[in-house]
Amino acid sequence: MQNNNRQELQTLRDLIRYAVSRLNAARVALGHGSDNAWDEAVYLVLHGLHLPPDTLDPFLDARVLPSERSRVLDLIDRRVTERLPAAYLTGEAWLRGHRFHVDRRVIVPRSPIAELLDEGLAPWVRDPLQVERALDMCTGSGCLAILAALAFPVAQVDAVDVSSDALEVAARNVAEYGLQDRLTLRQGNLFEALPAAAYDVIVCNPPYVNQASMGALPQEYRHEPALALAGGADGMDLVRRILAAAPGYLSADGVLVLEIGHERDHFEAAFPDLQPVWLDTAESSDQILLLTREQLNT
């Protein structure tokens, strides 16, 4: 459709249909919150119209003003032509129903660990109220640290990242959730900035993409900070350091929950003697592992 014909797009239904067609025709890469063109289109249209993400049905056939249409079309055009993840266009990302501020200083929140935190890490954590200290390593936007603080309501949570830029984004999110009294942001290289503490839960979504996969990433992913993605030749550079140090920071019954994406083969090659529990979620399989302090010490 030529630009001068786009004035024919009169309703939300029209705009969503057009957006789906554009996204499909351009073969954009998805995976930053949406896994299909319909959901991506609905999100962009509703955001452009300043409507909550769960209010499509009442407005589906509502007509839009010319200024509203222009605003929505600009989002769609930029999504297609610049190959920017939708979250970078809107300045927000949603994870398990929670909204987080994001920009290009952090990767877009999408870790399936969020689902496990939503369930309180049951059955590995028997009572969320018994978790006194939790740690989010490589926190980025702070999303997992915040979800951990919500899951474990009496816990003191530390969140660590090497990037000062990422921690600025995380600080904004922590403030928006009013968690400054229980959630401490720390800048440092993995465990070096941490106090001497025993954590009941450590969650970590580290850089784990192997070198070959980094070179093949779709354009959308290349807008994200490489520091938060690249895990070295086999993707295990930081994982090795984390597993080596983690036992010294876990409580006697503490657990480490670690995301490694599609790198299970590389993980098992690097750590043939480890026997982690592999945790599945609704959206992932063989991407998250759990290890106890006892396992890490053997």
From Swiss-Prot:
One of its GO terms (biological process) is methylation. CDD domains: AdoMet_MTases. Keywords: Methyltransferase, S-adenosyl-L-methionine, Transferase. Pfam families: MTS. One of its GO terms (cellular component) is cytosol. Its EC number is 2.1.1.298. It comes from the Bacteria. It catalyses: L-glutaminyl-[ribosomal protein uL3] + S-adenosyl-L-methionine = N(5)-methyl-L-glutaminyl-[ribosomal protein uL3] + S-adenosyl-L-homocysteine + H(+). Methylates large ribosomal subunit protein uL3 on a specific glutamine residue. This is Ribosomal protein uL3 glutamine methyltransferase.
